[in-house]
Amino acid sequence: MVEIIGGGILGLTLAYELLKQGRQVRVWERAPTLGGLMGRISFSELDGMSCDRYYHAILSSDRTLMHLMAELGLRERVGMVATKMGFYHNGHSYPMTTPLEFLRFPPLNMLDRTRLAYTILACRQIKDWRALEQIPVADWLTSLSGERVVRNIWAPLLRAKFDGDFSQVPATYIWSRLVRTTDTRTRGGSQELMCYLPNGYQELIEALATAIRARGGEIHTGTMVDQVQVVNGHAIGLLVGGQELASDQIVITTQTPIARRLLPPEAAEVSTGWGRLDGYLGIVCMLLVLRQRLTPYYTLNITDPSIPFTGVIETTNLIDPACVGGYHLVYLPKYVAPDSPYARMGDDELRTTFMRYLRQMFPDLRDEAIAAIRIGRERYVEPLHPLGATDRIPAVQSPIHGLFLANTGQIYPQLTNGESVCSFARQVADIVASQSRSAAGTRIKPDVTMNLL
């Protein structure tokens, strides 16, 4: 029996892949529902309308994810839409979707635009990313794009993404992001194609759960795993609600700080090793359900440092509003460090603050256009990979025989998204299924972890 701790998309995909290879699995999820960050939220005041708690994109280039959805019978339900992107700069919104709009972007002169275009093209040509992980992203971007482009475009975006401090962020971050997003462009770059499921990622979560149960797997929700049991360097089972359950192998898919709490004193050395790379940013996100469209953009990036949220993401410019009761969904995310004042704000204060800045951007937004508001919070969302992080990434198989760690912090240099998580889960399944319990220390090498390029 393989125990999988965590019922998010990583844990469920891993369980599904292991079942395909003939292994018995049990999935443990402490929340009452599956999906983790990709779960749904319901609005009783809107006749039970539900939508994704947070926004999640499916790109037209997400090959592993598309293959998984095809296996689960979802491929025909995937819609594809040409979306628009904009930039909010100095109090104005500018379209930045087509090459012509790019050339007209006022904050940049012709030389700046040329250098920005060169940066994007240069990223596409880089196949070996290793040298980039030792270079601070700001230094690398300055060498390619120039100081004006960094000051007006890159630095504001990086400050927003990393809650102000991106001094230790390696160049691999921008490289990976640009390579993935430019893969969605049509020939000539005039359109950006994105995909969606009518009922969001919950469709994939439910399809995975159905497939797991159909193949004999077990799923336990609303159940807290107390501790991994270790004897003489072997993981022998779990302690769940005071009951000891014998296991052959255990895979922890939770974020590293949570995973470390599950280890007993006998695993102190492993915990220390995992702790070498366990930094995460959290997120606070205000979701507005509107009765009318706010912008024409799926993503409106923000370069104004006074505005607290990272961007304005209007997902109903991708998904059909009919999928969410005819409403329009706007997400205002802010990534937060543990000591950020926004992480400590109460819901009412956060709502008031975000609405003040949103109305500064959109003065025509009226109260009667707002059907509902929700505040979402998560402590561990974005794993932090500082300069030279590769050697600090924990091995999938730990030195304790039969104990594995598999979470988003080990996905590198690719960014955390549905595609990279599903691809990672497939490769972890191969390791768990094929390696004997006597072999320890196998690491998925970062350069072969993902198959996105």
Task: Name what the model sees in each region.
Residues 21, 224-330, 334-343, 348, ...:
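Mid-domain catalytic core of redox enzymes
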Residues 19-44:
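Glycine-rich FAD pyrophosphate-binding loop
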Residues 407-432:
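A conserved FAD-binding loop/helix module that cradles the flavin
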Residues 1-27:
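N-terminal Rossmann-like FAD-binding beta1-loop-alpha1 element of flavoenzymes
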Residues 10, 33, 257:
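Conserved Rossmann-like nucleotide-cofactor binding loop
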